[in-house]
Amino acid sequence: MKRLLNIMRLPQGSDPRLARAHTIWLAISLTAMGCCIGGLGLFYAATAYTKLNSMAILYSYLTHPVILALNLLPAVALIWLGYFLFRRTWAGFLLSFLPIVGISMVNYFKIRLRSDPLLATDLRLAAEAGGIVGGYTLDITWLTWFTVFCFVAGLLFTIFLMPSGLRDWKNRAFGTLSCLALMGVAFYSWYLSPTLYQNTANNRFINQWSDVEVFVSKGCVYPFLYSFQEMFPTPPEGYNEGNAQTLLSAFADQDIPAEKKVSVMGIMLEAFCDLTDLPVLGEHEAVVRAYEPWHQLEEQSVTGNLLTNIFAGGTVDSEWGFLTGYTTHDDFRKPTDSYVWYFRSQGYQTMFSHPGYGWFYNRQNVNEYLGFEEQWFTDNHYEALVSPLSAIYNSDHILVTELANQLEDQVENGPCFSFAVSYQNHGPYETTFTSAVEHLTPTNSGLSQESCNIWNNYLNGVADTMDAMVWLTEELEAMEEPVVLVLFGDHKPWGGNGNSGYRELGVTFDLSTTEGFYDYYSTPYLIWANSAAKEVLGNDFVGDGGDFSHAFLMTELFNQCGWEGPAFMQLSRQMREITPMVHGQDLYLVDGAVTDTLEPEDSNFLQAFLGAQYYRENKVVPGA
């Protein structure tokens, strides 16, 4: 036993013959320790999404050696890097354990709470993380305590049984540079490779149409590192700047006729959806009654479904798609061409409003890049009216009152484009009690009390939202100024950890079917006009507007108004005729069915459209 301890610790004065055995022990134990850390990360990944069988997912990792290696390699490389840098194995353990397990835990809770994996782009929102998760309940499970045990045990093991380190600085420098070189080459050659990512498909136990399930099927560290490619502008496949410029220049911006200039107000409603679209609730009298104001408003409007890229979070994807027409885009860090800039070029005043902080999603900067001249946030307007915390529960009446007053004040100076993002009904929703009306009870619905509380609290919030929107239409109708109003939901609401509330409703979210896709991604929209606008535009603004991606909503608005619009919008009309949905998962809508395949000619046009879109986003200087 003493000889074994001497091999592990190699105290000064030990038999020189033990040095080689100690080196072998150190190499094996450090590598094994790194593999254990990586393995703990994989266990977090496998158990993150409650919809999946965690044991089956773990088994799939073991049967896919490339996925296994790509998830273990960073932990092993980091533990060796720390050892060479600091000459202590415990330092290597910390350098490996903290980032690898930290990323895995954040991903675990993010999926548990929002069905949304951790991506590299989320790092830009690190300062906002507290605001995002503040209302959620983090369940401290046995896995959390097991992680604490592993951390303490691993640290003690490396301190007392692996204390020795290299004293020769040349060997340490060589080892450090070797680790860095390995990590750099692996990152650029393996972790950012789309080809390798596709070739590591692990679809046996998942639905390949689900982003979160595909992410989980590849572990955590590997898909997280792969997502770094999304942090940098990447042109679409086959992109040629000259061809993109030529395609876009085939169209010219068309002015809005002076006699047809009407003010436009858009409001994106937080987590708004029509629960009566779900079969179980569509037959429930109390739920149908709650949505009567919305259904009556729909009868007076052009209506349809917005097919979003997101679920229960990621609000700005729908928001910015509407404002820009981009089906996909990079983060906005400079003035970027958008429909807001077009309105400005037509003499419109452009105004943005949100009863929350301007730093959230960096809206205060992004909105300026997209062309808004005036912005109202908590910081500069709403703080005196409602706190951001209270705004989650009760702010829509305040919002629409401010919007109506602002419009009345500003229209004297010319037509307005006003866009607002609501905050009321932001999830999660209280699970332990119902705050007001009990639309659903375990007796009349067959749901658990927790699910009843979730849906009741959501319904009470949206009922107030609908009341506010009806009030707004009445105010706009009374105005002499012609106004067109666009209302739409950004994404489906949170429905319990692991989507428990949806599961009890029998909603499977089977994304391989069109019905399941709609259940997961669709939200309603409507385009309403006051009498003055109907007269000016010669349109009654009633009927079916169709179902389409968020990027085509502004196009439909222009169609209803009889406006040609900017050059890019004219191109987008052609794209919409081929497929009204260009989804973030490379899915399309053809003849009313979701598909991942287009005819060759249509696919070629899609690539040309994406190229023109990329050119517009990155090369066109708005206002020039």
Pin down the residues of each PLM region:
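Hydrophobic N-terminal alpha-helices or hydrophobic patches in metabolic proteins across all domains
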Residues: 44-52, 58, 62-66, 70-72, ...
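Solvent-exposed soluble domains appended to multi-pass membrane proteins
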Residues: 249-259, 266-269, 274-624
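Membrane-interface segments at or immediately adjacent to transmembrane helices
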Residues: 189-266
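Short alpha-helical interface patches
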Residues: 114, 122-134, 143-146, 222-233, ...
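Transmembrane and membrane-interface helices of multi-pass
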Residues: 2-211
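Membrane-interface micro-motifs in multi-pass membrane enzymes
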Residues: 114, 120-123, 136, 209-221, ...
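Serine-centered coil/turn micro-motif
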Residues: 4-7, 203, 219, 337-338, ...
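Alpha-helix initiation and N-capping motif
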Residues: 123-126, 218-225, 244, 291, ...
